[in-house]
Amino acid sequence: MTMDKSELVQKAKLAEQAERYDDMAAAMKAVTEQGHELSNEERNLLSVAYKNVVGARRSSWRVISSIEQKTERNEKKQQMGKEYREKIEAELQDICSDVLELLDKYLILNATHAESKVFYLKMKGDYFRYLSEVASGDNKQTTVSNSQQAYQEAFEISKKEMQPTHPIRLGLALNFSVFYYEILNSPEKACSLAKTAFDEAIAELDTLNEESYKDSTLIMQLLRDNLTLWTSENQGDEGDAGEGEN
């Protein structure tokens, strides 16, 4: 029995409440594959589902990579760690490929509003960034380049079409600056991008509408936290907190 769109959306909401994000992602993937432009609510459900699904693997990958480095003297343990890391990598790559296919085949093509286009291009930048975190060699160069291209395109549209206080524009600036810091190792560019986004939003705080006030101010706080962390790291202090992402 095939479910119609409203049933699939309901299933995704149930799965979210049960914290079964793989089920949530599968339901929203099926909604997307019906080929209609997603509503804001559907778009957010899709994003939350995959963010949790991929986030669990990114976290596992970091833990296992760290353990692997600590077991260098024990060949057997290190081999076991390597095999397990590669299993997690394969899962992460499959998830990212799924999302990138949905973005290229349906979501970016069907986006009629600048806001949606920026949202999906940011998502494309994010998932290529996640791939680049576990890639090596030529593959890494390709994923890094694809990520930067998607972020840059989204960034240019957001500057033309959206208020500096818009949560999607701010979230893009946050993640693009993390990309510069973590992936391209360009702290100056990362700090400049984050600071500009923060300052421009502060200057127009009175344009914030009621519904996005909480989202926008939260992202502004993350931008400021990252700036503080990155500045202290570049002055030689060891920052122990991870970068905030949206």
From Swiss-Prot:
GO-annotated molecular function: enzyme binding; histone deacetylase binding; identical protein binding; phosphoprotein binding; phosphoserine residue binding; protein domain specific binding; protein kinase inhibitor activity; protein phosphatase inhibitor activity
UniProt keyword list: Acetylation, Cytoplasm, Isopeptide bond, Nitration, Phosphoprotein, Ubl conjugation
One GO cellular component term noted in the UniProt record for this chain: cytosol
Modified residues (N6-acetyllysine): K5, K51, K70, K117
Gene Ontology biological process terms, A to Z: negative regulation of DNA-templated transcription; negative regulation of G protein-coupled receptor signaling pathway; negative regulation of protein import into nucleus; positive regulation of transcription by RNA polymerase II; protein localization; protein targeting; signal transduction
Native source organism of the sequence: Rattus norvegicus (Rat)
Protein name per the record: 14-3-3 protein beta/alpha
Cross-referenced Gene3D superfamilies: 14-3-3 domain
Modified residues (Phosphothreonine): T2
Modified residues (Phosphoserine): S60, S186, S232
Post-translational modification: The alpha, brain-specific form differs from the beta form in being phosphorylated. Phosphorylated on Ser-60 by protein kinase C delta type catalytic subunit in a sphingosine-dependent fashion. Isoform Short contains a N-acetylmethionine at position 1.
Taxonomy, superkingdom: Eukaryota
Task performed by this protein: Adapter protein implicated in the regulation of a large spectrum of both general and specialized signaling pathways. Binds to a large number of partners, usually by recognition of a phosphoserine or phosphothreonine motif. Binding generally results in the modulation of the activity of the binding partner. Negative regulator of osteogenesis. Blocks the nuclear translocation of the phosphorylated form (by AKT1) of SRPK2 and antagonizes its stimulatory effect on cyclin D1 expression resulting in blockage of neuronal apoptosis elicited by SRPK2.
List of residues that carry N-acetylthreonine: T2
